[in-house]
Amino acid sequence: MNQNKQFSIVIAGGGSTYTAGIVMMLLENAERFPLRALKLYDIDEERQATIAEAIAIELKEKAPAIDFTWTTDPQTAFTDVDFCFAHIRSGGYKMREQDEKIPLKHHVVGQETCGPGGIAYGMRSIGDIIELIDFIEKYSPDCWMLNYSNPASIVAEACRRLRPDAKILNICDMPVGTQRRMSQIIGLQPKDLEVRYFGMNHFGWWTSVKDKAGNEYLPQIRDYVAHHGYLTQIEVDTQHMDASWQATHKKAQDLLAVDPHYLPNTYLKYYLYPDYVVAHSDPDYTRANEVEDGREKCVFSAAQKIIDAGTSDVGSFPIDSHASFIVDLACAIAFNTHERMLLIVENNGAVANIDDNIMVEVPCIVGKDGAEPLTQGKIPMFQRGMILNQAMVEKLVVDAWINHDYQELWQALTLSKTLPSAQVAKEVLDDLIEANREYWPELKHDEHEVHLISESAVSEI
C-alpha cells in the first residue's frame, strides 16, 4: 500500500459502545491513516442505527469527504474494504450477565473472559468470528481483519485451526492500558516504552520495561506495584476506571507477591485468587450490570442527544485515545512500519519451552506481511505450568466446539484453575448449556450416562 492511499474500513460490531470513540480516534489520526470510506456492520439493526445516526452527524460536520454507511448486509459491509476492525460481543450484554451470574451461583468465578464465563463466551464467539473471516475472504480477500473481540485466546486458537490462512491479527487492549499505567508511574509516555512480555491473552507477565535509550524500569515499577498495585495518581485511560477495575488494579500487588520477579497481568487474579474474587463478588450485580448502568447508558444517551439536536454541538463523542493501538496496527500493515506491538500469535518457538502450536501473547514486529514474534527464551517452571494448563483448557474448548462434544467441554471446565472439582464443573456446565441453547452447537453426550457421586453417597461410605 502506498503512502498516499486512503483506506476503506468496516467496523464489525457497529452497535458497540466503543464504536463512536474509535471513529473519533480515527478522525484524530486522519493524517497518518486517511479514510475514504467507513462502514459499520452489526446484526442488531436497531442498536447499530442509534450509534450510526449520531456518527453520521459527527462525520458530516468534521469529515464530510468520508463515505459513511451502516448495514446489516454482509455483502454491502465487506465489499471493497482494506481493514475490518472487529469488536463483536456474541450474545450481547444479556449473555454476558449469564456468563457472570451462573458461575457465581455455584460459588465459582463469574467473569466474562476467564473461567467458565470465558468458556461460555468463547463457545458463542467462535462461529461468529469464523463467519466474519469467511465474509472477508468472499468479498474483499486482500482485507486484513484486526480482531480485538473477546475471549481473544479461545478465538485465536479457533482461527488457527479452522482458518489457518486467514489474514487476521488478534490484539488486546489490556496490556496497552496497563502499560499506560506503567508509563505514568515512571513519568514517561506510553510510546517511550519497549517491553518484553510472555503469556496468553489475559494471562501473562512483563519481564522488562525499558525506555528507548535502553534504561530498565522494571525494578522501579515492581516496587511501586508491591505497595499500590497498578493504581495511579492520575487515571490514564477511560476504559478501566470503574470501581471494579480500581479493585482489580489494586489486587496486582498480591499477584506480584506470588512471583516478585515479573509484573503480572491483572487478570491473573481470577486464576491465583479465585476464592477472593468470589468472596468479593455480588452475585446479583456483576460487571455486566455495572457496564449497562454506566457506559451503556452514557454512550447511548449521548448518541440520542446528538440525533435529537441534529448537531454534535450539544456534546461530541469523546476520542477513545486508548484505542489508538488499532490505528498503530493498521498503519504497521499498510505502510510496513515494523511497529513493535503485543499480539496473540502462534508460538513457533517464541517461548522456547512450551508447545509451538499454543497461541501466545508476545511482542511482535508488524509489517505488510503480518506479525513476526520476538523470541522470549525459556520461561520459569511456575509460569510454564500455568500457561500449559490454560492452553489445554482452551484447546479443549475449541475441540468441544468443533466436535460438538459434551465430554470435552466438561474436561475443559474441570481443568480450569477457576473451578474446584469435576462435580462443580459439570453442574456449572449444565446450567451454561441451558442458558446458551440459542448460541452453542448442540453437544453430544457419550453413550454411557455420567453418574457422579452425590454428597449423600459420600457420607454413607
Swiss-Prot record:
Listed GO MF terms: maltose-6'-phosphate glucosidase activity; metal ion binding; oxidoreductase activity, acting on the CH-OH group of donors, NAD or NADP as acceptor
Source organism: Lacticaseibacillus paracasei (strain ATCC 334 / BCRC 17002 / CCUG 31169 / CIP 107868 / KCTC 3260 / NRRL B-441) (Lactobacillus paracasei)
The enzyme's E.C. designation: 3.2.1.122
Free-text comment on the cofactor: Binds 1 divalent metal ion per subunit. Mn(2+).
Keywords: Carbohydrate metabolism, Glycosidase, Hydrolase, Manganese, Metal-binding, NAD
Source domain of life: Bacteria
Family: Belongs to the glycosyl hydrolase 4 family.
A Pfam family hit: Glyco_hydro_4C
Cofactor field: Mn(2+); NAD(+)
Catalytic activity: alpha-maltose 6'-phosphate + H2O = D-glucose 6-phosphate + D-glucose
Catalytic residues (UniProt): D173 (proton donor), Y267 (proton acceptor)
Residues marked Increases basicity of active site Tyr (site): E112
UniProt-annotated binding residues for Mn(2+): C172, H202
Gene Ontology terms: biological process: carbohydrate metabolic process
Residues that, per the record, bind NAD(+): 7-73
Binding site for substrate: R96, N150, R287
Descriptive protein name: 6-phospho-alpha-glucosidase 2
PROSITE patterns: GLYCOSYL_HYDROL_F4 (PS01324)
